């Protein structure tokens, strides 16, 4: 074998060889247990970043491990290829989105292949390909026919730069678009929605079926679904037959209601507004109308409101209370109205103080007898109901039930469960997305495109002049079609689908990616699903993961799959962070090449100013990124993989460190030299097991300890970093061992390479073949622990006198307490320190030490 480790040569060689062998193809007919390993597929931006590399390397190690452990493995890859960036690139560069996207996919695929990922590329999918989005459209129609897809007029978040609708999740807490950075506006449009709310309770309760998910992610979904148990109460409007309906989780406070608040958009707002207040109310509505929901409900923003002049009546006590409108009440949430209980709600208390509204105490602490205490803040804890008519003296927690029963009896309201989750708005006014397969007919209304006419393809003769209206809305030849039902002139839907639709089912397509007759074969999908290990970023905790769970349940109810949940286990890998330099005076980031270390400080090379330094997520704007191509070019894929796996536990953030990269490169070189030395000095005959020396047994123990520790590290939480540490320990044990003529040494070399194979697949394969094997190392079996090899024949016994260590001796691991004391006394150390001494007490800790207490 070559004396020097040449990563570039062996990696290229084996990547080509694995393709020829078809090593990464998914076994179709096998009796082996299945394992489906999947990384969240990328958007084809054109270049891999280190976050990508970490994600895909983690999944690849798991896939390779499971193959070695005897599983048939599905490990596919594809492209989340629709979306605004491609369309914006077409505008900026003057090239079609498809051309830009497919070029990027090709480029990124080559980059992924250089990492040595064991991906079955024959199952590659691209969501922008007609053969994929045909089935996205078909699945949409399944939901439409089931009543889960519908259109309605809705106030939406409008991005004025990208000229499209944004879901609430795509607007930040300051009211800006997550992608373009534009200030989001409110706009009334007819939009398509999916009834995810029909599955709210299932989505919530089935989180208990996911023990393999991080608690943090489950909590985020639980909060987003936002189940509230309470009551629906109605407040009559004075002088009207109308009533204001509110939802409350605190019916026990209803006697403390001193005002009600409507959303500015509420249909009753204009009806309750008096002529005197109309001008002010109209101005307020106009002011609020351009603010996003996120902006209006932000907790740190002052709440604004105005009196309408109207009055409501609290049916429980007959009191007249003012009606206001306020920005923090949203018509799309709940009933679009809330009751104000300032004495027992923090937000209401602050709002009432600002508006000089009455504050009425109806709950007091159990140990208090003051029924009208002065308040400096809202009292929100449980207590005793007061000033509440027939409910005075009742525990407030019991009062909730009592009030609801009374309301139902008197016709004031009823018990109700409400969810924060809203239906999923899927319309997008853009070109580069999956067309919604419906036609609007003046006679027939909305008509589904027949299955035989799918896919509704995106037209190619599109002119991109700027980010104004959707290009599809201008294409008369494409829009105008006969109605599929009556044959009369009709128009296509010009909105496209939210790209999260594409990614809500892609994992199912992988199970049968080349099927031209159906989205996926039911038998194949049910065979491979659910995904055994899913890997991706925490940023997808709510959107993608929740939508995919909804899709799976909806398709289950259509008889298309037989599972409740798509992802058994979820690993959310941490970010890759780079060393970042920043001028604290100007706030500007400084590239590393402009930084010098001088007088114990990092300084700007040009100005000499002291810079602050820290680790942050890699990005171009912070000049702290590391190009994977440069790392692979200098060290090779195996070194990059080893560093990423060793530097931090997978769920933690990883701080990039060139010195540690170099350290992993040195380790692989040591492994190379270790095998080269073994082959150079390999004996012609091997000792029999019965002839094993103590050194042989110690080495075998080190080998099987490594198998045990690494196997345990790679189950459960996938602690790759500690597994790599164990690989290093085994390598060191083999380097230090002198028993090359022993069969144990050969076992150690082979075991090291198989254990290394999932982490550094190229060097492991090369060295395996150098040992003389023809069959790929990746087709071997994961080593199993021999319990007998872990048994320790001898241990090191510490001898202490008065608690101080005086020496050690080797003793049998099975020696009794009496035998240990005897051996310690008879040892050279014992005789030297105990001769002529009066031993008062002997403390024996089996397997560790003997401590002699002597008289002073």
Curated annotation (Swiss-Prot):
Entry annotated with the keyword ATP-binding: yes
Bilayer-crossing regions: none
Compartments reported by the entry: Cytoplasm
Sites where the protein binds ATP: 620
GO function terms (MF aspect): aminoacyl-tRNA deacylase activity; ATP binding; leucine-tRNA ligase activity
A matching Pfam family: tRNA-synt_1
Motif 'HIGH' region per record, residues: 42-52
GO BP field: leucyl-tRNA aminoacylation
Enzyme class: ligase
Segments carrying motif 'KMSKS' region: 617-621
Classification via CDD domains: Anticodon_Ia_Leu_BEm, LeuRS_core
Entry EC no(s): 6.1.1.4
Gene3D superfamilies named in the record: HUPs, Isoleucyl-tRNA Synthetase, Domain 1
Key word Aminoacyl-tRNA synthetase present: yes
Disulfide-bonded cysteines: none
Location (main, coarse): cytoplasm
Domain of life of the source: Bacteria
Catalysed reaction equations from the record: tRNA(Leu) + L-leucine + ATP = L-leucyl-tRNA(Leu) + AMP + diphosphate
Keyword list, A-Z: Aminoacyl-tRNA synthetase, ATP-binding, Cytoplasm, Ligase, Nucleotide-binding, Protein biosynthesis
GO CC annotations on file: cytosol
NCBIfam families: leuS_bact
Family of this protein: Belongs to the class-I aminoacyl-tRNA synthetase family.
Descriptive protein name: Leucine--tRNA ligase
């Amino acid at each position: 074998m070559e004396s020097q480790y040449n990563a570039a040569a062996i990696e290229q060689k084996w990547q080509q060889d694995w393709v020829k062998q078809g090593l990464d193809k998914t076994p179709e007919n096998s009796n082996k247990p299945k394992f489906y390993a999947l990384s969240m597929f990328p958007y084809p931006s054109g270049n891999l970043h280190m976050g990508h590399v970490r994600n895909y390397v983690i999944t690849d190690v798991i896939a390779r491990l499971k193959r070695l452990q005897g599983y048939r493995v599905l490990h596919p890859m594809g492209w989340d290829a629709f979306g605004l960036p491609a369309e914006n690139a077409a505008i900026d560069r003057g090239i079609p989105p498809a051309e830009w996207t497919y070029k990027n996919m090709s480029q990124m695929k080559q980059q992924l292949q250089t990492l040595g990922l064991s991906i079955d590329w024959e199952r590659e999918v691209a969501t922008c390909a007609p053969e994929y989005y045909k089935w996205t459209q078909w699945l949409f129609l399944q939901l439409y026919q089931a009543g889960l897809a519908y259109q309605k007029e809705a106030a939406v978040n409008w991005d004025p730069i990208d000229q499209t609708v944004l879901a609430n999740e795509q607007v930040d807490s300051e009211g800006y678009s997550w992608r373009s950075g534009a200030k989001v506006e409110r706009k009334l449009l007819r939009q398509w929605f999916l009834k995810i709310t029909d599955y709210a309770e299932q989505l919530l309760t089935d989180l208990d079926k996911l023990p393999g998910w991080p608690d943090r992610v489950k909590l985020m979904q639980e909060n987003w679904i936002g189940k509230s148990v309470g009551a629906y109460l109605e407040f009559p409007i004075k002088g009207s037959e109308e009533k204001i309906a509110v939802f409350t989780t605190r019916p026990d406070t209803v006697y403390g209601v001193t005002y009600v608040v409507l959303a500015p958009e509420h249909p009753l707002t204009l009806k309750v507004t008096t002529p005197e207040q109309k001008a002010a109310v109209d101005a307020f509505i106009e002011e609020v109308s351009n603010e996003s929901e996120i902006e209006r409900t932000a907790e740190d923003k002052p709440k604004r409101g105005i009196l309408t002049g109207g009055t409501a009546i609290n049916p429980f006590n007959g009191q007249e209370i003012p009606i206001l409108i306020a920005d923090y009440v949203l018509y799309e949430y709940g009933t679009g109205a809330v009751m104000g209980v300032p004495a027992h709600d923090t937000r209401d208390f602050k709002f009432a103080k600002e508006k000089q509204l009455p504050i009425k105490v109806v709950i007091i602490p159990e140990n208090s007898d003051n029924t009208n205490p002065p308040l400096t803040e809202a009292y929100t804890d449980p207590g005793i109901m007061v000033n509440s008519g027939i409910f005075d003296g009742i525990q407030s927690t019991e009062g909730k039930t009592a009030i609801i029963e009374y309301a139902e009896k008197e016709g004031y309201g009823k018990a109700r469960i409400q969810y924060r989750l809203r239906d999923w708005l899927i319309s997008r006014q853009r070109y580069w997305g999956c067309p919604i397969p419906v036609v609007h007919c003046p006679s027939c209304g909305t008509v589904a495109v027949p299955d035989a006419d799918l896919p509704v393809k995106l037209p190619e003769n599109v002119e991109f002049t700027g980010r104004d209206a959707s290009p599809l809305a201008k294409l008369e030849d494409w829009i105008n079609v006969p109605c599929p039902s009556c044959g009369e002139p009709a128009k296509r839907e010009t909105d496209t689908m939210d790209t999260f639709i594409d990614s809500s089912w892609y994992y199912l397509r992988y199970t049968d990616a080349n099927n031209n007759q159906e989205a996926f074969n039911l038998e194949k999908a049910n065979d491979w699903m659910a995904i055994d290990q899913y890997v991706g970023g925490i940023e997808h905790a709510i959107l993608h993961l929740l939508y995919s769970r909804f899709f799976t349940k909806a398709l289950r109810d259509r008889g298309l799959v037989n599972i409740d949940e798509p992802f058994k286990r979820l690993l959310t890998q941490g970010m890759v962070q780079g060393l970042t330099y920043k001028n604290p005076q100007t706030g500007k980031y400084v590239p590393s090449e402009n930084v010098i270390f001088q007088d114990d400080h990092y300084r700007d090379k040009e100005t000499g100013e002291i810079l602050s330094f820290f680790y942050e997520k890699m990005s171009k704007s912070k000049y702290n990124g590391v190009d994977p191509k440069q790392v692979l070019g200098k060290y090779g894929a195996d070194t990059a993989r080893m560093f990423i796996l060793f530097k931090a536990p997978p769920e933690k953030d990883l701080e990039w460190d060139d010195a540690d990269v170099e350290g992993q490169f040195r380790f692989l070189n040591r492994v190379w030299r270790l095998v080269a030395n073994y082959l150079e000095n390999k004996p012609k005959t091997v000792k029999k097991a019965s002839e094993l020396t103590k050194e042989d047994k110690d080495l075998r123990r080190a080998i099987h300890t490594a198998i045990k520790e690494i196997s345990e590290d790679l189950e459960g939480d996938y602690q790759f970093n500690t597994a790599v540490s164990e690989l290093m320990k085994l390598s060191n044990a083999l380097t230090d061992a002198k028993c090359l003529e022993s069969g144990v040494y050969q076992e150690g070399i082979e075991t090291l390479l198989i254990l290394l194979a999932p982490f550094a697949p190229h060097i492991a394969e090369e060295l395996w073949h150098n040992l003389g094997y023809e069959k790929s190392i990746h087709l071997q079996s994961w080593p199993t622990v021999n319990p007998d090899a872990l048994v320790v024949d001898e241990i090191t016994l510490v001898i202490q006198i008065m608690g101080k260590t005086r020496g050690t001796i080797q003793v049998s691991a099975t020696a009794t307490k009496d035998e240990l004391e005897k051996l310690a006394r008879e040892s050279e150390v014992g005789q030297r320190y105990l001769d002529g001494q009066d031993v008062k007490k002997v403390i024996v800790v089996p397997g560790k030490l003997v401590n002699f207490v002597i008289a002073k």
